[in-house]
């Protein structure tokens, strides 16, 4: 079934636009199965309405969650079905992303996951640009949300995410992922793109979030979590254990990865840190000739742009 959830306007000034949205929904024809339109009787806000839709996974077994400013590929359903088959029973995963962002959301630098033998990578952050959940994945999040305090998991999350306003749920999801050590699986080629229309978070249109859509692929290589090299933490940094699979330059050391130089001191608790920050006494150094940055460590590029200290 297709479920369209329309929030109740919180102020009278939005009532006319809200009525137009409801009329558009009622006029929509869905030939693929049942269509249900839910007009919320009281304002839930963006977060409440999104979580209402996510909870549909517990009713139907799984849900594809799309906000209204997304354009989807014709292949999104094939990817969602294949990803659910591959990952639906893995308790280490909190959800499946339909979107593949082009940038690091904390530093706004380009983000390029290292290639491996799969069409996916893993990241300890969520996305607002299209997700898929199983009933078990949403139930786990719901149970955590009911028990968690406002600071649960916060020590392991970037300050930018902790400072997000109440009408943004990415910070809450980041705390959940950090606290429970769960990940989202992401496609390397995006099945959604954000049109960047004005709304709750943007006063005018933006193309910043747009990415190319994969419109042709029919079969996706859903590499299991344990076999993947491209596994990233909540700071877009490659997990040390995965980096050690690609090079022996750091193997045997207890180190944190901070190549984007965005981790606060509270996250740098390992014996060593691999970083692009200036260091006075580095045990090893690497250049910065290659992209992504970890490629310099893998190739042993000489230089002093990256430090193990």
Feature locations, PLM:
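Peripheral/terminal regions associated with large enzymatic or DNA-binding modules
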Residues: 1-66, 70-309
């Amino acid at each position: 079934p297709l479920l369209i959830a329309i929030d109740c306007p919180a102020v009278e000034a939005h009532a006319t636009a809200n009525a137009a949205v409801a009329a558009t929904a009622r006029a929509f024809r869905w030939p693929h199965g049942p269509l249900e339109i839910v007009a919320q009787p009281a304002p839930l806000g963006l977060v409440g309405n999104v979580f209402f839709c996510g909870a549909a996974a517990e009713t139907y077994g799984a849900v594809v969650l799309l906000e209204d400013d997304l354009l989807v590929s014709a292949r999104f359903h094939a990817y969602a079905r294949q990803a659910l088959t591959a990952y639906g029973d893995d308790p280490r995963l909190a959800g499946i992303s339909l979107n593949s962002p082009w940038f690091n959301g904390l530093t706004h630098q380009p983000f390029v996951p290292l290639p491996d033998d799969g069409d996916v990578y893993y990241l300890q952050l969520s996305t607002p640009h299209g997700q898929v959940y199983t009933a078990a994945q949403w139930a786990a999040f719901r149970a955590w949300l009911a028990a968690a305090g406002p600071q649960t998991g916060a020590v392991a999350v970037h300050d930018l995410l902790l400072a997000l306003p109440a009408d943004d749920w990415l910070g809450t999801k980041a705390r959940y992922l950090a606290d429970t050590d769960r990940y989202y699986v992401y496609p390397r080629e995006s099945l959604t793109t954000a049109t960047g229309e004005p709304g709750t978070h943007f006063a005018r249109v933006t193309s910043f979030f747009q990415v190319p859509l994969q419109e042709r692929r029919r079969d996706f290589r859903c590499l299991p979590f344990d076999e993947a090299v491209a596994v990233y933490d909540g700071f877009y940094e490659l997990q040390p254990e995965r980096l050690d699979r690609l090079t022996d330059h750091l193997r045997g050391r207890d180190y944190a990865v901070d190549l984007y130089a965005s981790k606060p001191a509270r996250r740098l608790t390992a014996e060593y840190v691999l970083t692009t920050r200036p260091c006075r006494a580095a045990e090893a150094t690497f250049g910065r000739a290659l992209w992504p940055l970890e490629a310099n460590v893998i190739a042993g590029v000489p230089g002093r742009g990256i430090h193990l200290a």
